[in-house]
């Protein structure tokens, strides 16, 4: 498909979902899809282990596998009527019989793309075309990333209004040219290195996932540390910033 939120839209339409439980610790990328399809949304908390803090649900449970910290064994133990969002765990295998979605743009330099594993079907005839959205990807090979940041943001915003489409032929072709084993190995090594450096200070008890998305670092004085670095060209990832308002609710 063309994007992760439309993978959810696909499931809503094909399974006729009318009620869904979503984590509070999440960006608003799916809000429009849920509103447009008239889905009742119940929000739930997660713990510091990123597991849902609820004992039952009477609709579908949307599980976000934050930072790849949820094992397939745990996911299977949750039972039926669940949807797994592996947008942050691209290299984790889907579980037979459980609807699972992946997004490609979080891991690879492609302008669109999502993968959905499901046993439900609806006809999707329109194929996305992404050739006109390659500028910010190609430009970074010869210029600085900051020069193309606006194009990157505009591309992300575009999908908020895009209907369900199939993945573009261009993205499909690019994905077939990736050395996935190399990417998985390098990402795993990077996560392990960071965890070795920060394990004692990190308030999170982490597992090292294969092909990690990013390293989540939760420090007791994290807000002060951020202030100290705000005038330095230091990398603060957007995901950490947009979720920060929920951190205190996780305790």
Q: For the regions a protein language model found, what residue spans apply to each?
A:
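Active-site regions of enzymes building and remodeling cell-envelope glycoconjugates
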Residues: 37-42, 58-61, 77-83, 96-103, ...
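PLP-dependent aminotransferase-like
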Residues: 2, 6-81, 86-90
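Short beta-strand-to-loop capping motifs
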Residues: 32, 118, 217-221
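Conserved glycine-rich beta-strand-loop-beta hairpin in the small C-terminal domain of fold type I
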Residues: 166-195, 204-218
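Active-site C-terminal subdomain of aminotransferase-like
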Residues: 121-170
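Conserved PLP cofactor-binding pocket of PLP-dependent enzymes
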Residues: 207-218, 222-251
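Active-site PLP attachment segment
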Residues: 97-139
């Amino acid at each position: 498909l063309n994007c992760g939120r439309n993978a959810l839209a696909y499931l809503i339409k094909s399974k006729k979902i009318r009620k869904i439980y979503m984590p509070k610790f999440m960006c608003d990328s799916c809000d429009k899809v849920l509103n447009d399809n008239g889905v009742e949304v119940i929000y739930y908390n997660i713990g510091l282990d990123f597991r849902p803090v609820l004992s039952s649900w009477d609709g579908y449970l949307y599980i976000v596998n934050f930072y790849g910290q949820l094992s397939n064994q745990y996911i299977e133990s949750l039972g039926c009527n669940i949807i797994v969002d592996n947008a942050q765990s691209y290299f984790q295998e889907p579980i037979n019989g459980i609807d699972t979605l992946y997004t490609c743009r979080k891991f690879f330099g492609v302008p669109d793309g999502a993968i959905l594993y499901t046993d439900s079907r609806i006809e999707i005839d329109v194929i996305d075309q992404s050739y006109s959205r390659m500028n910010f990807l190609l430009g970074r090979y010869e210029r600085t990333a900051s020069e193309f940041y606006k194009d990157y943001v505009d591309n992300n915003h575009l999908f908020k209004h895009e209907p369900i489409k199939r993945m573009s032929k261009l993205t499909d072709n690019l994905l077939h040219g990736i050395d996935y084993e190399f990417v998985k190995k390098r990402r795993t090594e990077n996560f392990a290195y960071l965890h070795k450096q920060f394990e004692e200070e990190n308030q999170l008890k982490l597992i090292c996932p294969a092909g990690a998305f990013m390293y989540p670092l939760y420090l007791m004085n994290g807000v002060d540390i951020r202030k100290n670095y705000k005038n330095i060209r230091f990398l603060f990832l957007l995901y950490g910033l947009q979720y920060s308002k929920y951190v205190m609710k996780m305790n």
